[in-house]
């Protein structure tokens, strides 16, 4: 794989503008050398130059270049985001070297969340793989392509635990589970940063959004978060800490308030927890325009007050506003912000630039000018093989009645639906520098898979939505939803005619990518009515109906589950999505994905998640009782539980065996099962291990994921899968906010999803 190759690019500094001899050199990338270097550099800087380092601005095609040139000349910019080509980045770094007094390099950042030019499945899809090797692949390829474009940092990974699918940004995260999110976030940081973010094909990560952004009330974007410290530290904080412990150089601070205090002005969060308790040494970055929003939050009286509060609370870099540059000079002059506080913020920024290797070579991620690609979007710059492999693993088979899947590569296949041939939507939101024309749609993938062996007929069938208000809202800044010029009846009739002449119908339905994005919260998480009408009409033809879902959140699918013969959850699968989906539909790849979020039966169940507390009156489906924790108009559990996903083969999991009945605090026990492929096809499944603290000083979840392993087995093959358990897997923040494990009985559950498990037990001494 080209991204694993050791590419020795000798950067000829002779081709770049002259560098300051006393600033640039072969500096050791050690904390001691960095601290001495930055201390000396700070002594040479004016107040305005220090403030300039704290400013992070967006530079896109619409920005006035001359104004930016003057800001760079005057040292008023510390970093730039949203510039994504080597040529454009080089111009601005050249301006620093040619025009500014101290020649302090800029760093360049972008939202490389699930790929740069090659777009991988959205993070929720990647989480469905339950495969850390897939995460590593996405991280390394994304970093390679980002660095190859001249970028130094990415605003990723997003590790906000979310249990509310109404929230549009659930698509960016790894789901509802703390352990899974922490494990995947940690792995992504390690993969993207490599041995060092200074390496030619690595980038520095920025864990986001600190903190608890995924818990906004009602799933409504930018809303408030209010929760107990126990819930915060047990369920929401571990993924951030895991990413920082893995070495992430930056943290993006959330836009929400937490227990009444905006995260942007929360010194307890940014200093007491982040710096003092966790020992974080990198930079904190405000989210877009967050400092000025403190006024609307009601925690700052005016712009100057907002800047004072933000800086003193621990915000190092201000993203996309002019508040720091406008108001910090006066605040420092008046003494309302001390020079020590300004120096501390500037030091953090200079530290990460040092760690990026920019003071050794400000062009380290650019190379010599004559190496710039002639075509930034050249096909040769993509990593299609890796994208297809990862996309396959992200797909989750939700239903397969009477072995409807895999399909035969013969006969006539109707491919219908508003998302079946959408190059933009298959990429998902936050698709970075990906080019829609380079993505493979489901229709294209199916045609490629069957070749001349089958006839494929296509009909759009419906718009994603016919709700004019929703279309207007989603298309406010860009065309996120396309509306066909034909009437709904004309499109529906075309789809029905296509279905009637076919042996099987594949309907690609769900959400446009813009419906599962920032500022895209929903109160209704069913498939839009226009598409529900299409599904009903297709069902009425009597032809076998396969639903291919394309969406960025769990959807309420009770009706569709009744109508469809098979359902394949594909999320937004990326550049190679169409080929990967076709691989699964026709059996060239046996699906192995598992759900990282529970699928509710209706929006009224939200939040529904597997690791809930038992309550004093738990509902028992075998012995239903009115006076238990339940709804009277809806079944209690989700439609599809966390960890769920089918295969084209079957698996048998044995009883759980414990290596010992007791666990000492300085030891470990091992829980093991025998897993057998009891079907007729080779396939993989994810064996999941959950733990329950039966009796504790405070109520604990009914089960919590503490390990998983994907195993591939041939028909009849059996393998032992073992999970070590130590005291760290049992610790929690108790009522006194002490992090510890309490002696007593623990249950261990192992199975193929969170509902179908076998149980054993042990005791912690």
Predicted features, each with a name:
Residues 1-19:
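Gram-negative bacterial Sec-dependent N-terminal signal peptides
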Residues 3, 755-758:
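Short glycine/proline-enriched turn or capping motifs at secondary-structure junctions
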Residues 20-734, 740-754, 761-763:
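Glycoside hydrolase catalytic-domain context in secreted enzymes
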